[in-house]
């Protein structure tokens, strides 16, 4: 391997302990995805620094490697055609490239179509394992010259005109390119299913399942409509369900339509209103169909139809009213004010639904309609003290065998206030349940309640604080903690002090406490990435091998901590390899900027790449998994 030629695409971020990814000269063309990702426009020829005593090398993929030392030689510009020819010359004639999509995309996005021509002339095929998805994504399609180049060279790229049209119509306003494709199709044997194209244009998701963040350009669709590219029925059925502007355009052009079809299609409110205002007559069947279909802007439709006297009491049934209670509860208040439908209402269903929704207005209406509030007090108490209290104010009486306060009911900010103001329970007793519910809004509220009190903070709340610290310092709970004035005990003061970055105070607290060997405290210190506190804990616990092994596992979140413990303590880095790999994956989501370097370092030290991302390792008996679950941290 000493005499092989390798290339370096970019320098590593951490130059204090650099780990280089180097590429076999004969395979660089296969790795233009990495070049495209880094946006590097140069490539450096290197020799491996295998004369260095600390030299290490490990295979990363088939033809690229990780190494700790390189000797840089010559830098080449990737925008120079001579460099491209050099890479072509290095390629083994018998080797078939696995992927060249990013090779071509790299040069097209740089507007170096001359180099693309050179690659085509050199018989470098366009290869994309995902078809043409990489080529026809929304970013590339914003480049007019790039799309034009693909169209002009489509015999080489072999893109279906269907997907070219779809991408251009979906993401651009390059109208002349649509006309250009239509002209090319007319001169060839190619055919586009324009009806399928139209339906796919209105899809909210692309072929990879990603949400499409673009609006349909009605102008270009109108041109295709005028050119009679669509079947009239497919066109009308598709448009009325998706685009009001195009719906009006079709009607104004004189398209024949069936009003029954429009009603059956459960169109949006603006479309329904438009056709009614055109003078189309709503039959009884139409109205029943609208009333029974409680989706697609139902609330707006029913209010409009009632306000304009298209719907009266005669159209409602008990079944329809019950559906409204279930699916459009807040519509019922409007309907009962406008129409005489009380006899159709299942008052028991309405009362229970009103209690579940904490809707005092509807509860009062039910009582006005004859409901006995006493019969629903037990139901209300089990649900929420707030609505139970309101029911009492409306004349309800608590059963002799019950108390208005139900300790098992779900807590809200309003219910907590009622409980505390009426001395139904104490904040100390409520805290464990609040902690278990782990509602961030309620916890923030409780932090304010606890401020400047003498109430001792339970350890469960500290675990929530640590969890908020773990997932990111920009969240509300973390911000609330560091700005609060709570009654913390000695251990909690250490934890909170770390979060507040009061490191000078913390050292003395650790020395004078019995918590110096706490694994939980060690975890928080590694989250802080403070090297001095980390050194202090290691120094105090230097003879505890179990503690040191935990320190190594937790340090995987921060390269400088990990490197320190490896360099200064006799750690067996392979003893807990599964746990280290689990921690590495967690940190991929927490601190992506460090995760690759840590992973590469471990690979250089002999870790198997198959160990990473292997969720079969998440055995509950593994100490790290058990610890994280006790902390309430969900493993990803």
UniProtKB/Swiss-Prot annotation:
It comes from the Viruses. The keyword Lyase does not apply. The keyword Repeat applies. Disulfide bonds: none annotated. ANK repeats lie at residues 63-97, 99-129, 130-159, 161-190, 230-259, 261-284, 322-355, 372-400, 425-455, 517-546, 548-575. Keywords: ANK repeat, Repeat. This is Putative ankyrin repeat protein L766. It comes from Acanthamoeba polyphaga mimivirus (APMV).
């Amino acid at each position: 391997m000493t005499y092989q030629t390798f290339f370096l695409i970019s320098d590593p971020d951490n130059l204090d302990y650099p780990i280089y990814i180097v590429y076999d000269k004969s395979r660089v063309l296969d790795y233009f995805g990495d070049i495209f990702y880094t946006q590097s426009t140069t490539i450096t020829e290197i020799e491996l620094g295998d004369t260095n005593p600390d030299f290490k090398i490990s295979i990363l993929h088939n033809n690229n490697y990780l190494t700790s030392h390189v000797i840089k030689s010559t830098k080449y510009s990737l925008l120079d055609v001579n460099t491209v020819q050099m890479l072509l010359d290095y390629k083994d004639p018998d080797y078939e490239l696995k992927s060249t999509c990013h090779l071509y995309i790299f040069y097209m996005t740089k507007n170096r179509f001359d180099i693309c021509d050179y690659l085509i002339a050199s018989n470098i095929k366009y290869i994309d394992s995902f078809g043409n998805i990489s080529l026809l994504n929304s970013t590339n399609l914003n480049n007019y010259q790039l799309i034009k180049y693909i169209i002009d060279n489509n015999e080489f790229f072999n893109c279906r005109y269907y997907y070219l049209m779809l991408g251009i119509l979906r993401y651009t306003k390059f109208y002349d390119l649509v006309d250009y494709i239509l002209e090319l199709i007319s001169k060839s044997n190619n055919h586009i299913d324009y009806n399928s194209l139209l339906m796919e244009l209105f899809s909210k998701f692309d072929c990879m399942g990603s949400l499409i963040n673009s609006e349909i350009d009605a102008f270009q669709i109108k041109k295709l409509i005028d050119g009679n590219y669509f079947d009239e029925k497919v066109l009308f059925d598709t448009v009325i369900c998706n685009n009001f502007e195009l719906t009006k355009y079709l009607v104004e052009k004189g398209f024949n339509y069936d009003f029954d079809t429009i009603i059956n299609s459960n169109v949006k409110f603006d479309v329904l209103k438009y056709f009614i205002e055109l003078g189309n007559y709503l039959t009884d069947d139409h109205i029943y169909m609208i009333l029974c279909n409680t989706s697609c802007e139902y609330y707006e439709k029913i209010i409009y139809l009632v306000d304009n006297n298209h719907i009266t009491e005669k159209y409602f049934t008990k079944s329809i009213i019950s559906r409204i209670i279930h699916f459009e509860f807040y519509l019922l208040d409007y309907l009962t004010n406008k129409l005489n439908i009380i006899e159709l209402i299942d008052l028991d269903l309405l009362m229970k639904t009103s209690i579940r929704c904490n809707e005092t207005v509807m509860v009062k209406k039910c009582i006005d309609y004859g409901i006995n509030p006493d019969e629903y007090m037990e139901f209300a108490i089990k649900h929420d003290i707030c609505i139970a209290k309101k029911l009492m104010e409306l004349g309800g009486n608590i059963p002799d065998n019950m108390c208005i306060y139900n300790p098992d009911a779900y807590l809200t900010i309003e219910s907590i206030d009622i409980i505390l103001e009426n001395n139904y329970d104490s904040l100390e007793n409520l805290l464990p349940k609040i902690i278990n519910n782990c509602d961030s809004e309620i916890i923030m509220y409780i932090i304010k309640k606890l401020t400047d009190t003498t109430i001792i903070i339970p350890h469960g709340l500290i675990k929530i604080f640590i969890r908020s610290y773990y997932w990111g310092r920009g969240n509300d709970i973390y911000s609330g903690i560091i700005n609060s004035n709570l009654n913390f005990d000695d251990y909690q003061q250490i934890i909170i002090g770390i979060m507040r970055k009061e490191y000078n105070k913390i050292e003395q607290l650790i020395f004078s406490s019995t918590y110096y060997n706490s694994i939980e405290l060690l975890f928080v210190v590694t989250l802080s990435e403070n090297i001095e506190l980390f050194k202090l804990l290691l120094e105090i616990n230097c003879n505890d091998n179990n503690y040191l092994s935990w320190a190594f596992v937790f340090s995987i979140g921060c390269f400088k901590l990990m490197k320190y413990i490896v360099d200064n303590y006799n750690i067996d880095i392979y003893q807990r390899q599964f746990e280290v790999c689990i921690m590495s994956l967690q940190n991929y989501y927490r601190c992506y900027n460090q995760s690759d370097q840590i992973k590469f370092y471990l690979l250089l030290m002999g870790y198997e790449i198959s160990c990473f991302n292997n969720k079969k390792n998440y055995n509950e008996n593994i100490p790290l998994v058990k610890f994280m679950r006790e902390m309430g941290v969900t493993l990803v």
